[in-house]
């Protein structure tokens, strides 16, 4: 297991590499280069510069998140072959600079969705919050405007250029069966997995967030049965999973420790995002601290499953609360995620030492 920390780059992330380097137990980052438009090839020069900055700070850069999949691939348009070719070249360039895992998603239109970005807790901290009932009567356009207006920082998956043609894109997904989206996904995997196998990269698909359908858009990555279908689409270790405890765990029907054990034993868990959520009702939750008792997930059981079944995976704390007056990108503060790492590392040490006696 390698503990990492997500970093968006010096241009847009208020958290510095020096900050990250000072968190105990962090080996490296899960990187992002969100300034590159979706569908474009990531150049060797840009990747080299990014990785060099990370390495010069004394950190590893072996995982990249969000090499986003162009909407034309998800829709199955003829132009998808152009974007798949760009994607393969990007993978080759990433591998040449030591990248071993790429975390991505196959969510149409929205990468993730919350109804509040700064929900105030009783202790004065703020957190990400979701209430499905609040979507009633709202349009996707309403949600996009409210989300973008709520943050002074760029949001991953909510890049304005991606959402510029929202009406047109939404219309193309209307009445699309889940099986059709899954077939388009198979086409994408069949196009990239040979390159992954050649260069030694493992793809790690991130679950739908939250773990159910929204606005009638087909979604195919939010349950154990969905994950089983995905690993069966292309039977290769290069076609692996990123098990996000908070995304899958937003639906209490998903047994996150069991999912980690099942796919870890298959060798198909390349990465894990570890965070806690607090259930507040049906399809209603807030993102709590990482401490088990603050939320509804058993973080010890999750870490034990990673320890016993996914020991060759990269993990990171996921979203955190805004505490101690910190401001920044919603869900990605320094202080609460650093606390999360300390807690997760404490669990890991306890599990390691308990198994030795």
UniProtKB/Swiss-Prot annotation:
EC number: 4.2.1.8
Keyword vocabulary terms for this entry: Iron, Lyase, Manganese
Entry keyword Cytoplasm: no
Cofactor(s) listed: Fe(2+); Mn(2+)
Pathway: Carbohydrate metabolism; pentose and glucuronate interconversion
Catalytic reaction(s) noted: D-mannonate = 2-dehydro-3-deoxy-D-gluconate + H2O
MF terms in GO: ferrous iron binding; manganese ion binding; mannonate dehydratase activity
BP GO terms, sorted: D-glucuronate catabolic process
Superkingdom of origin organism: Bacteria
Pfam families recorded: UxuA
Function statement: Catalyzes the dehydration of D-mannonate.
Entry similarity comment: Belongs to the mannonate dehydratase family.
Name listed for the protein in its UniProt record: Mannonate dehydratase
Organism annotation: Cutibacterium acnes (strain DSM 16379 / KPA171202)
């Amino acid at each position: 297991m390698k503990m990492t920390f997500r970093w968006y780059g010096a241009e847009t992330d208020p958290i510095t590499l020096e900050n990250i380097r000072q968190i105990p137990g962090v080996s490296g980052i899960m990187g992002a280069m969100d300034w590159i438009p979706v569908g474009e090839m990531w150049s060797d020069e840009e990747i080299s510069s990014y990785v060099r900055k990370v390495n010069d700070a004394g950190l590893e850069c072996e995982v990249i998140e969000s090499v986003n999949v162009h909407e034309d691939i998800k829709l199955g348009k003829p132009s998808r072959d152009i974007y798949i070719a760009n994607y393969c070249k990007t993978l080759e360039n990433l591998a040449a600079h030591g990248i071993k895992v790429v975390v991505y998603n196959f969510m149409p239109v929205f990468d993730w969705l919350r109804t509040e970005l700064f929900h105030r807790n009783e202790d004065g901290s703020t957190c990400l919050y979701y209430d499905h009932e609040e979507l009633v009567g709202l349009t996707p356009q309403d949600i996009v405007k409210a989300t973008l207006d709520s943050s002074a920082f760029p949001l991953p998956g909510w890049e304005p250029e991606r959402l510029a043609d929202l009406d047109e894109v939404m219309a193309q997904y209307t009445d699309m069966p889940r099986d059709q989206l899954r077939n388009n996904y198979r086409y994408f995997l069949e196009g990239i997995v040979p390159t992954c196998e050649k260069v030694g990269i493992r793809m790690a698909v991130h679950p739908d967030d939250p773990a159910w359908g929204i606005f009638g858009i087909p979604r195919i990555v939010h349950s154990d049965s969905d994950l089983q279908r995905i690993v069966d689409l292309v039977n290769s270790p290069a076609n692996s999973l990123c098990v996000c405890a908070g995304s899958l765990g937003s639906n209490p029907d998903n047994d996150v420790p069991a999912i980690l054990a099942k796919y870890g034993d298959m060798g198909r868990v390349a990465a894990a995002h570890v965070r806690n959520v607090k259930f507040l009702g049906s399809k209603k939750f807030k993102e709590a601290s990482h401490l088990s008792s603050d939320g509804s997930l058993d973080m010890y059981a999750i870490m034990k499953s990673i320890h016993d079944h996914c020991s060759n995976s990269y993990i990171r704390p996921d979203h955190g609360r805004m505490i101690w007056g910190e401001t920044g990108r919603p869900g990605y503060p320094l202080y609460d995620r650093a606390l999360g790492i300390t807690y997760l590392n404490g669990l890991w040490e306890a599990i390691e030492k308990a198994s030795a006696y």
